[in-house]
C-alpha cells in the first residue's frame, strides 16, 4: 500500500467533512422519504412506512412497486454519476470533466437507442454492458483527442463534437425506425427515472456498487494524480495505469446509469464541486463518500421536483438537472477562478 | 504550387463540382425524368407542367439551399474557430442551433401550423448569439456549449408539455434538406450575398488576431469591437444556414479543416476555399442521403429519406478522429 501524506490543498479539520457527509446523508434520507410520500395519492410519512412494512397495505403497490424502486434508483444512479464525475475531474485534473461533456454518456445513449428503436431484444441485464462498449469507445476517442491538455475549452469542444456525432447517430438510428418511433426516441434522448422498476435497480445497483468500490480502492492514487504527474510518479503511483483505471471506472458508472435512465446531465459535474465547496477540501479520498451521497441527493431531489413542479405533466429529470446544473456550475466556477485576460 | 495558386485551383474545382452536383440533383429523384425533359423544364419550355414543378420547385431549390447553407456553415466555422482559436470549434459550439430549435419549438407550441417558423429560427439563433457575447467573454467555447445545453433542456421541456411538434423539431436539430421550396432559397441567398463578402473583408484582421491577443492589440486591433463583429458575422451565417436547413453537424468543422490542409491558415484564402468546400460537402452528403435506400433485416420498410444531418454526422465522426489525432500529436 502506498502511503501518501495528507495532500489537501486547503486542509481543514476532518470533522467538517464528516459533519457535512452525515448532514447530506440525513437530507438524502429525508428526500427518499418524501419521494415515498408524494404522488397520487400523497400520504404522510407514517402511512408510507406502514406500506413498506405491511404487505396487505392498500398503498403497497404505489409505494413499494412504483415509488420505492424509482427513488432508490435515483440514489444509486446519482451516487454513480457523482463518483464518475469526481474520478474524471481528479484523474484528468480538469474541473469541467464529466461524463456528459466527455461524450461518455452520449456514446452509451447511441447503443441504448439502437437497442430500443431497432427492437433488438437484448435482455435488460446485458444492456449496461453493451452501453458500456459505446461509452468506452466514445470516451477513449475523446481522451485521445484531449491528450495532455488541461484547457477546459479544448475538452469541452472535443466532447461537444463527440456528442454531436453520437446525436447524429442516434437520429440516424431513429430514422431507420418507423414514424411512431420518433416519440419513443425523444424519450431516450432525455434522462428520466419515470417507469423504472425493481429490474432496472437490480441491473444497475451491482455495477454502481462495484464502481464505487473500485473508486474507494483507488482513492489515494487518484488523489496523488491531482498533485501533478511528476509528483504522483515520485510518490510511486503508476500514473498512466491509474488514470486509465479511473477513466474506465467512470465510463462504467456512466454507462450503467445511461443504460437504465438515459443521459442525465450535470449531476456528475456538479456533485464533486458541491462537495469540495461544502467541505473546503479538494482531497479525493475525503470527499469521495460525500460526493456519492451528494450525487444521490441531487438526483432524488431533482426527480422529486421534476415529478411535482408541472404536475400533472412530468418533467424528465434530465431536463431539471440541466436547468439547475448549468447555472450552479457557472456560479461555483466563477467564484473560484480569477478572470483571465485572454479570450479563447 | 503556392497556397494562393492552390486556392484558385480549389475554388475553380469546387465551382465545377458544384455545377456537377446541381446537374446530379436535377437528374435524380423519386420520378424518373429524362435529361432532355429536365433541360426543357429548366428553361421553361417543357410540355408537361408537372415536370416544371418537379425540376423548378422541388429539385432546384433543394440543391441550391444545400450549396448555400453549406457555404454559410463553413464560413461560420472558420470565424468561430478563429475567435476561439481552436480548430475543433464549429457553429454549433456557439449554441445558436439550440437557440433556433428553441424558438422554432416555442412558435410551433404557441401557434401550431403557423408559417412563422423561418423568422423564429433566425431570431432565435441571433438572440442566442447576442446572449453568448454578453455572458461568454471569458470562454466562448465553454459558455456556448453550456448555453446550448440549457436551451436544449428548455426545448425538451416544451416538447414534454406538448409533443405535437417533435417530428419537425427533431429534423431541425439534425438538419434536413427534404422538401425545400423556392421560398427557402429566396430567404437564403441574400444572406450569402451579404455575409460571404463581409467575412472575406475580415480575413486579414483574422490573420492578425491569430497571432494572439497581446500581439493583435499591439498591432492596432481593437479586440472588443473586432470580436463583436466577427461573432456577429459568424452567428448571422450560422443562423441563416440553420434557418434554411437545420443544424447540420460537422460541415462547419470539416470544411475549414480540409481547407486548412489545402491552403494553410491564411484566412484570405481560407474563407473562400472553405465556403466552396462546405457547399460541395453538404450538397454531396445530401445527394447520398437522398439516394440511400437499403433494406435492413428486422425492419418492415426500406430505409430512405434519411435527413442529411445524419449522413454528415456519420461522415464527420472519422474526420473528427483524424483531427483529434493531429491535435494530440501537436
Give the location of each predicted region.
Chain A
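Alpha-helical transmembrane segments in inner-membrane proteins
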Residues: 1-344
Amino acid at each position: 500500500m502506498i502511503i501518501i501524506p495528507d495532500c489537501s490543498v486547503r486542509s481543514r479539520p476532518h470533522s467538517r467533512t464528516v459533519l457535512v457527509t452525515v448532514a447530506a446523508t440525513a437530507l438524502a434520507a429525508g428526500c427518499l422519504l418524501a419521494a415515498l410520500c408524494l404522488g397520487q395519492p400523497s400520504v404522510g410519512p407514517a402511512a408510507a412506512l406502514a406500506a413498506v412494512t405491511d404487505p396487505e397495505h392498500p398503498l403497497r403497490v404505489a409505494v413499494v412497486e412504483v415509488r420505492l424502486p424509482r427513488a432508490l434508483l435515483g440514489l444509486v444512479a446519482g451516487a454513480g454519476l457523482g463518483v464518475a464525475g469526481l474520478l474524471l475531474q481528479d484523474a484528468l485534473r480538469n474541473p469541467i470533466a464529466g461524463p456528459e461533456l466527455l461524450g461518455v454518456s452520449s456514446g452509451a445513449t447511441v447503443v441504448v437507442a439502437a437497442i430500443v428503436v431497432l427492437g433488438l431484444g437484448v435482455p435488460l441485464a446485458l444492456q449496461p454492458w453493451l452501453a458500456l462498449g459505446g461509452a468506452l469507445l466514445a470516451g477513449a476517442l475523446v481522451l485521445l483527442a484531449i491528450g495532455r491538455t488541461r484547457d477546459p475549452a479544448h475538452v469541452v469542444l472535443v466532447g461537444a463534437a463527440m456528442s454531436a456525432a453520437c446525436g447524429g447517430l442516434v437520429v440516424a438510428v431513429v430514422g431507420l425506425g418507423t414514424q411512431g418511433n420518433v416519440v419513443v426516441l425523444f424519450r431516450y434522448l432525455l434522462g428520466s427515472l419515470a417507469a423504472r422498476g425493481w429490474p432496472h435497480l437490480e441491473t444497475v445497483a451491482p455495477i454502481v456498487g462495484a464502481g464505487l468500490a473500485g473508486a474507494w480502492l483507488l482513492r489515494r492514487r487518484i488523489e496523488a494524480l491531482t498533485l501533478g504527474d511528476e509528483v504522483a510518479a515520485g510518490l510511486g503511483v503508476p500514473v498512466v495505469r491509474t488514470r486509465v483505471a479511473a477513466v474506465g471506472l467512470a465510463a462504467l458508472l456512466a454507462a450503467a446509469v445511461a443504460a437504465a435512465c438515459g443521459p442525465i446531465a450535470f449531476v456528475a459535474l456538479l456533485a464533486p464541486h458541491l462537495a469540495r465547496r461544502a467541505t473546503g477540501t479538494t482531497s479525493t479520498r475525503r470527499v469521495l463518500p460525500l460526493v456519492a451521497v451528494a450525487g444521490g441527493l441531487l438526483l432524488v431531489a431533482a426527480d422529486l421536483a421534476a415529478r411535482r413542479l408541472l404536475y400533472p405533466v412530468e418533467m424528465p429529470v434530465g431536463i431539471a438537472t440541466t436547468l439547475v446544473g448549468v447555472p450552479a456550475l457557472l456560479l461555483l466556477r466563477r467564484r473560484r477562478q480569477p478572470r483571465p485576460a485572454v479570450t479563447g | 504550387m503556392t497556397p494562393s495558386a492552390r486556392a484558385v485551383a480549389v475554388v475553380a474545382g469546387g465551382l465545377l463540382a458544384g455545377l456537377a452536383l446541381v446537374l446530379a440533383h436535377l437528374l435524380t429523384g423519386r420520378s424518373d425524368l429524362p435529361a432532355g425533359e429536365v433541360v426543357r423544364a429548366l428553361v421553361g419550355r417543357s410540355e408537361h407542367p408537372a415536370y416544371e414543378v418537379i425540376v423548378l420547385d422541388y429539385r432546384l431549390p433543394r440543391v441550391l439551399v444545400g450549396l448555400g447553407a453549406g457555404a454559410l456553415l463553413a464560413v461560420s466555422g472558420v470565424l468561430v474557430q478563429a475567435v476561439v482559436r481552436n480548430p475543433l470549434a464549429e457553429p454549433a459550439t456557439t449554441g445558436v442551433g439550440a437557440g433556433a430549435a428553441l424558438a422554432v419549438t416555442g412558435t410551433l407550441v404557441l401557434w401550431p401550423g403557423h408559417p412563422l417558423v423561418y423568422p423564429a429560427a433566425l431570431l432565435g439563433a441571433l438572440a442566442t448569439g447576442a446572449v453568448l457575447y454578453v455572458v461568454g467573454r471569458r470562454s466562448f467555447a465553454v459558455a456556448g456549449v453550456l448555453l446550448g445545453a440549457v436551451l436544449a433542456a428548455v426545448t425538451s421541456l416544451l416538447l414534454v408539455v406538448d409533443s405535437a411538434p417533435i417530428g419537425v423539431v427533431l429534423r431541425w436539430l439534425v438538419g434536413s434538406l427534404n422538401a425545400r421550396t423556392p421560398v427557402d432559397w429566396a430567404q437564403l441567398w441574400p444572406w450569402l450575398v451579404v455575409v460571404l463578402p463581409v467575412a472575406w473583408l475580415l480575413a486579414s484582421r483574422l490573420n492578425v488576431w491569430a497571432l494572439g491577443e497581446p500581439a493583435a492589440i499591439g498591432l492596432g486591433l481593437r479586440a472588443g469591437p473586432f470580436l463583436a463583429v466577427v461573432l456577429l458575422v459568424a452567428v448571422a451565417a450560422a443562423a441563416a444556414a440553420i434557418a434554411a436547413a437545420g443544424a447540420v453537424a460537422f460541415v462547419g468543422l470539416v470544411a475549414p479543416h480540409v481547407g486548412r490542409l489545402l491552403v494553410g491558415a491564411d484566412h484570405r484564402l481560407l474563407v473562400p476555399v472553405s465556403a466552396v468546400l462546405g457547399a460541395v460537402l453538404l450538397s454531396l452528403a445530401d445527394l447520398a442521403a437522398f439516394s440511400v435506400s437499403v433494406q435492413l433485416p428486422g425492419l418492415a420498410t426500406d430505409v430512405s429519406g434519411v435527413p442529411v444531418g445524419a449522413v454528415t454526422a456519420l461522415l464527420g465522426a472519422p474526420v473528427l478522429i483524424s483531427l483529434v489525432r493531429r491535435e494530440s500529436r501537436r
